[in-house]
UniProtKB/Swiss-Prot annotation:
EC primary class: hydrolase
UniProt-recorded Gene Ontology molecular function terms: alkylbase DNA N-glycosylase activity; DNA binding
Keyword terms: DNA damage, DNA repair, Hydrolase
Gene3D superfamilies: Methylpurine-DNA glycosylase (MPG)
One GO term (biological process): base-excision repair
Protein name: Putative 3-methyladenine DNA glycosylase
Family recorded in the similarity comment: Belongs to the DNA glycosylase MPG family.
EC number: 3.2.2.-
Amino acid sequence: MKRLNREFYTRDTIEVAKDLLGKIIVVENETKLLGKIVEVEAYGGISDKAAHSYGNRKTERTKIMYEEGGYVYVFQIYGMYNCLNIVSSKKDVPEAVLIRAVEPIENIDDFSKNRYGKDFNELTKYQQKNITNGPGKLCMAMNITKKFNGLDLCKDNIYIVDNKEEFEIVASKRIGIDYAEEAKDYLWRFYIKDSKYVSKK
């Protein structure tokens, strides 16, 4: 499997977001975990009131967003849940794509142990359905921590590979950004229509 190259990530953020759907995230730690991206949200940087970098806020936390596309940006919500973002666009254009949900592809027991401490077939139906259908959940299941912040998808132990398949993309409002005034209405959340791993339809 070949990693996506830098040029994939340095394009328009909306296009990157839509094109990430169906691609495979690979995390290599003790084992190799593969998850198909089924839901994303685009964040348009300086002019997007929902983005951490809105108004050109360059801080210790957001400085990785100012790198060229293809770097990992991990932040925490509620002081405990990690969220995986893919930096997009050109250098000094602080935009990113939030990975909201993935479908486990390989070594699903490892996903399950990371998330619940037991094998997948020991989980309840509810737990199986909720294993990776949200940004914090997928980070727990794939063991993506703050240590991943700043890693390079083009050379480090987390990367994304191409995957050819056809599906219908749904565009909708982003989730949990009611504070963002007009930006809360942007249709910048994209997901694979028939995926059962999408967080919310």
